[in-house]
């Protein structure tokens, strides 16, 4: 170490300090700024990428929430449509049953009316035939007692009117 101190030159030392400071100034002016700019740009790029990733993650979560909401709404709408369709089907079935019952009752009433009409017509025909037969029988039996046919018809109708047929 003593040898180094003996070889020490103040002029060389000052020259080395001036060169070192000059080198630092040159590096600061030409290299340091581009290096810091590149580091800052890289840092900003990383921050932007992280923000973009966070925004994308948030957007993805929002989209998933929207998809779930839309899916839930679609399910509710489907359930409501199925419920409405079932109600319409049941109403149509009930209406058809009611209409069929009404038509059945109407047909039964028409059939009863037709039967009653036929029955009355048959009864009238039967009464007419019975009265004609009765007249013929009475005419034969009572030919001597009643000479007038009108009186004979009145008597038979009176007797048939007294007899009620079911």
Curated annotation (Swiss-Prot):
It is found in: Cell inner membrane. CDD domains: ATP-synt_Fo_b (cd06503). GO terms for molecular function: proton-transporting ATP synthase activity, rotational mechanism; proton-transporting ATPase activity, rotational mechanism. It is a single-pass membrane protein. Keywords: ATP synthesis, Cell inner membrane, Cell membrane, CF(0), Hydrogen ion transport, Ion transport, Membrane, Transmembrane, Transmembrane helix, Transport. One of its GO terms (cellular component) is proton-transporting ATP synthase complex. F(1)F(0) ATP synthase produces ATP from ADP in the presence of a proton or sodium gradient. F-type ATPases consist of two structural domains, F(1) containing the extramembraneous catalytic core and F(0) containing the membrane proton channel, linked together by a central stalk and a peripheral stalk. During catalysis, ATP synthesis in the catalytic domain of F(1) is coupled via a rotary mechanism of the central stalk subunits to proton translocation. Belongs to the ATPase B chain family. F-type ATPases have 2 components, F(1) - the catalytic core - and F(0) - the membrane proton channel. F(1) has five subunits: alpha(3), beta(3), gamma(1), delta(1), epsilon(1). F(0) has three main subunits: a(1), b(2) and c(10-14). The alpha and beta chains form an alternating ring which encloses part of the gamma chain. F(1) is attached to F(0) by a central stalk formed by the gamma and epsilon chains, while a peripheral stalk is formed by the delta and b chains. This is ATP synthase subunit b. It comes from Flavobacterium psychrophilum (strain ATCC 49511 / DSM 21280 / CIP 103535 / JIP02/86).
């Amino acid at each position: 170490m003593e040898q180094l101190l003996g070889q020490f030159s103040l002029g060389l030392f000052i020259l080395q300090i001036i060169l070192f400071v000059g080198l630092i100034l040159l590096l600061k002016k030409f290299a340091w700024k581009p290096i810091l700019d590149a580091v800052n740009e890289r840092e900003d790029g990383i921050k932007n990428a992280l923000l973009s990733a966070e925004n994308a993650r948030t957007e993805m979560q929002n989209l998933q929430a929207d998809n779930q909401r839309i899916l839930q709404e679609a399910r509710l709408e489907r359930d409501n449509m199925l419920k409405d369709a079932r109600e319409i089907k049941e109403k149509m079935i009930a209406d058809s049953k009611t209409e069929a019952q009404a038509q059945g009752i109407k047909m039964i009433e028409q059939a009863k009316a037709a039967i009653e009409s036929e029955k009355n017509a048959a009864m009238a025909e039967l009464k007419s035939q019975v009265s004609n037969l009765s007249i013929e029988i009475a005419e034969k039996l009572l030919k001597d007692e009643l000479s007038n046919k009108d009186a004979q018809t009145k008597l038979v109708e009176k007797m048939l009117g007294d007899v009620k047929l079911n």
